[in-house]
Amino acid sequence: GFIAATSGDESATGSSWAPFAPTSDGVDSGARQIAEHVGRQYRLPTGEQIVAVTGGPLELQGLPMKIAVRKSVADGGEIDVLDGKGVLYRMCGLGPDCAIVKGRPTPERALLLRREALELALYSFHDLDDVEHVVVFMPPPKGEKPSVALHFGRDDVAGQLARPLQATLPLPVPNPDTITTAPNTPAVQQLTFAKLFRFSLTQSNQDTSVFLVLDPLPTES
């Protein structure tokens, strides 16, 4: 439903930016509400929800995660350890290892899930307190382990946050059959393609934290 503005600062409310806003700006319950709301919007042509989405702080089994981005040799080959509060979303298709059991794995479906990840990120930066990073674990192909994530920094989407959500992600929400002709899909492709990474987790040897290692995906020639 439509949420009325509760203060003079409209940019901080759900009403002017998007019809939905979580009732909490914390990374626990706020991210959980965003995950539930966004997850229900994305469906197969049959009407079935594609993935279950969970959200919360950037941690693994209670241990905080530090993001370490390994750049390709072409981009300098450095490792950047990123600071700032983060949110972690997980998309699960409810098959083995969270693979999607319904429908066919197509490039269109993958693009639709990237649109969903972008929507999760935009809500998180707009509505949650002091979030600087959003990581979304994507569902794997059948027979594989989850290995692909999207990582967004707040600055990556500053332009989108300054406009209402529907300017970036117009309604109605597309499905795998309609995503390629949906308004603004080229912008979604551009905003998300460079944010795809192969992820791995490794325990830090210095403290009780975990490194979330993000490696660039091999580019298709």
How should each PLM-predicted stretch be described?
Residues G1-R115, P141-S221:
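Bimodal "functional hotspot" detector
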Residues L122-V148:
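A short amphipathic beta-strand at an alpha->beta junction
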Residues V73-D75, A117-L122, V135:
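Residue-level detector of functional hotspots within protein domains
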Residues A110-D127:
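Long, charged/polar, surface-exposed segments that mediate recognition or autoinhibition
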